[in-house]
Amino acid sequence: NLIQFGNMIQCANKGSRPTRHYMDYGCYCGWGGSGTPVDELDRCCQTHDDCYGEAEKKGCYPKLTLYSWDCTGNVPICSPKAECKDFVCACDAEAAKCFAKATYNDANWNIDTKTRC
């Protein structure tokens, strides 16, 4: 679920940036998304959105699905349980790892999506 996703982000980025800083970043980080991603981090969000879309096609509810995971060496690791839980956990874990590798550009936070996306 979204709270677990936030915790995964903190695991992967070693708590270096609050989760809320990713909620209104670029064209895809946060609710919805459209246009061309502004950078690598925004592409991580686009991929995460697409993954959630695939989860929904499988009949899962990714924003609400609870799953089991651990933070091991700043890497989110999913604990297999059931199809929806595994799929959503993998979406979130891959996004959290992607966020940790991508550069955060302050100029891409809270942008005007109508003109830039």
UniProtKB/Swiss-Prot annotation:
Expressed by the venom gland. One of its GO terms (molecular function) is calcium ion binding. Keywords: Calcium, Disulfide bond, Hydrolase, Lipid degradation, Lipid metabolism, Metal-binding, Secreted. Its main location: secreted. It catalyses: a 1,2-diacyl-sn-glycero-3-phosphocholine + H2O = a 1-acyl-sn-glycero-3-phosphocholine + a fatty acid + H(+). The active site is at H48, D92. CDD domains: PLA2c. It comes from the Eukaryota. Gene3D superfamilies: Phospholipase A2 domain (1.20.90.10). Coiled coil: none annotated. It is an enzyme of class 3 (hydrolase). Disulfide bonds join C11-C71, C27-C117, C29-C45, C44-C98, C51-C91, C60-C84, C78-C89. It is found in: Secreted. Its EC number is 3.1.1.4. One of its GO terms (biological process) is lipid catabolic process. GO terms for cellular component: extracellular region. Its cofactor is Ca(2+). Ca(2+) binds at Y28, G30, G32, D49. Transmembrane segments: none annotated. Belongs to the phospholipase A2 family. Group I subfamily. D49 sub-subfamily. PLA2 catalyzes the calcium-dependent hydrolysis of the 2-acyl groups in 3-sn-phosphoglycerides. This is Acidic phospholipase A2 PA-1G. It comes from Pseudechis australis (Mulga snake). The lineage of its organism: Eukaryota, Metazoa, Chordata, Craniata, Vertebrata.
